[in-house]
Each structure stands twice: as structure tokens, then as C-alpha cells.
């Protein structure tokens, strides 16, 4: 685990302890009962693939540790609506506050503003957080293999499955990929960002994609800015992408989403 992830785990475990003291598991389960059923995150991405289209997980992210504030005029419901209008298949919403200025209410508000399934984008360590995610309306959780043991990852995955949610398993290298493939989740995300150096390269996805059989759905994460980037990864059978910063910085988010998915030329021809 990197020093960055170790620091994150320290504050996350403090957050979890504080949350448990305020909101019990029974409270979370009561909140879950008031949520609409999971919308089918994996199913939505498969539908795009089967239709011969790129599947986009569009991210709602106010800030990041490496880039600082990304979008000053930050309104999750408006962004969710714009992403849906632009053709996104799913949402990813940051709920981590210290590093990304995220919040649970951003997830709930964004999901309520559209019909898209939503991922709780956060650092998951305990099953309590899985119950939080469902209570807030999430349809999917993220597991970062670099920060979890095999047993921890499986426990979190199984808890999510029990709640009807999907699980996106994130890897960055071959060793993490081998571990991820031991899990049953069909959603595998390849993060092109090195969490040690923050360098980003699409060659990470290109190197790891051949390790994965066709029964899994690969998601390219980080470093995807243009339709050409999507086409490049399509060459290694990656047709689904998680994109945040490059879209969040655009004034017209819906138009930027369409351009990413279909290309500037296709948009101009409309």
C-alpha cells in the first residue's frame, strides 16, 4: 500500500468509527428501506456494449488531491442531468470529503436527478460503508485492490451483492489484476494513474487488458480525455470508461459528454 493510501486509510477508519457512534447499522438499514431498488449498474454498462456503443461512467467530482478544485460552480443534480442528456450510462459520485471535497448528499442528490445507476466513489474498508452506500442510494461500490487484502475485498463484495448492488474492482498492476480475478464481480476497472507518482498512461490498460477473459467487463479509468483515447482502448477490448475531470472542466457538460462518446465530427454532423 502506498503512503497516500495509508494516510487515507487512517482517516477513513476514524471517520467510520465516528459514523458508527452516530448512525447505527439498524439506522442505515431503515434508510435503505426508504431508497428505490438498485438500478443495475453492471446491467446498464452491458446494455451499451451490446448496442455497440461506448459505456460511460461519468464522474461528479468537485476536487482532487493532485489538481485541487476542479469545478467551482458545482451542482450535482445539474451535472447528473447533463451527463444523462449527453449519453452516459452510469454516474460515479465522490463521497470522500478530506481528499475530494465529496459528500454523501452529493450522491443522493445526483441520483435523484436522473435515471442513471450511481457508484459510491470512496475508499472502502468496512462492511458498514457498504450499508452507508445503499442507504444513500448507491447502486455500486468501488473496491481498490491496492488498499485491501483478498479477504477484505471478498467480504465487501459479498456484502454489496447481498444488498443487490454491483461492485467495481479497481487495479493498477498485474499482481492486483490476478487478485481481482479471484473475486466473482464481473466489473474490473484498470486505473491508468500510478497512486505512487500520480503519473497517468493508457499503456497501463493496454498491458493489463489481455489478462482478462470475455466474461468480465473492463473499465478504463483516468487519462481518458478524448474520443480518440476511447478508440485507442477499444483496440484492447475496453469499451467502457470512467471519466471525470476532463468533463467536469467543460462549460457545457452534456456536449462534452457527447463529444467524448461519439467524436467531435459526429456531433458537428448532427
Curated annotation (Swiss-Prot):
Which GO biological process annotations does it have? L-tryptophan biosynthetic process
A GO molecular-function descriptor = indole-3-glycerol-phosphate synthase activity
Q: What is its EC number?
A: 4.1.1.48
Q: Which pathway does it serve?
A: Amino-acid biosynthesis; L-tryptophan biosynthesis; L-tryptophan from chorismate: step 4/5
> What catalytic activity is recorded?
1-(2-carboxyphenylamino)-1-deoxy-D-ribulose 5-phosphate + H(+) = (1S,2R)-1-C-(indol-3-yl)glycerol 3-phosphate + CO2 + H2O
The record, for HAMAP family, names:
IGPS_B
Official protein name in the record: Indole-3-glycerol phosphate synthase
Q: Which gene encodes it?
A: trpC
Amino acid at each position: 500500500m502506498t503512503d497516500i493510501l495509508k494516510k487515507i486509510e487512517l482517516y477513513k477508519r476514524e471517520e467510520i468509527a465516528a459514523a458508527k457512534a452516530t448512525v447505527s447499522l439498524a439506522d442505515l438499514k431503515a434508510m435503505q428501506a426508504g431508497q428505490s431498488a438498485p438500478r443495475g449498474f453492471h446491467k446498464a454498462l452491458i446494455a451499451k456494449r451490446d448496442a455497440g456503443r461506448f459505456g460511460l461512467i461519468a464522474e461528479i467530482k468537485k476536487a482532487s488531491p493532485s489538481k485541487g478544485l476542479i469545478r467551482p460552480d458545482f451542482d450535482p443534480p445539474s451535472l447528473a442531468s447533463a451527463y444523462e442528456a449527453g449519453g452516459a450510462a452510469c454516474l460515479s459520485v465522490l463521497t470522500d470529503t478530506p481528499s475530494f471535497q465529496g459528500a454523501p448528499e452529493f450522491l443522493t442528490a445526483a441520483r435523484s436527478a436522473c435515471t442513471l445507476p450511481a457508484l459510491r466513489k470512496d475508499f472502502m474498508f468496512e462492511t458498514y460503508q457498504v450499508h452507508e452506500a445503499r442507504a444513500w442510494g448507491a447502486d455500486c461500490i468501488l473496491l481498490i485492490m491496492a488498499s485491501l487484502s483478498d479477504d477484505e475485498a471478498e467480504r465487501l463484495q459479498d456484502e454489496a451483492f447481498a444488498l443487490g448492488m454491483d461492485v467495481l474492482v479497481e487495479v493498477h498492476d498485474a499482481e492486483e489484476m490476478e487478485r481481482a480475478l479471484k473475486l466473482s464481480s464481473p466489473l474490473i476497472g484498470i486505473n491508468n494513474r500510478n497512486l505512487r507518482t500520480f503519473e497517468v498512461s493508457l499503456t497501463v490498460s493496454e498491458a493489463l487488458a489481455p489478462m482478462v477473459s470475455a466474461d468480465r467487463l473492463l473499465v478504463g479509468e483516468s487519462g481518458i480525455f478524448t474520443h480518440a483515447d476511447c478508440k485507442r482502448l477499444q483496440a484492447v477490448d475496453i469499451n467502457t470508461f470512467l471519466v471525470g475531470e476532463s468533463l467536469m472542466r467543460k462549460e457545457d457538460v452534456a456536449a462534452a459528454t457527447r463529444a467524448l462518446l461519439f467524436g467531435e465530427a459526429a456531433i458537428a454532423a448532427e
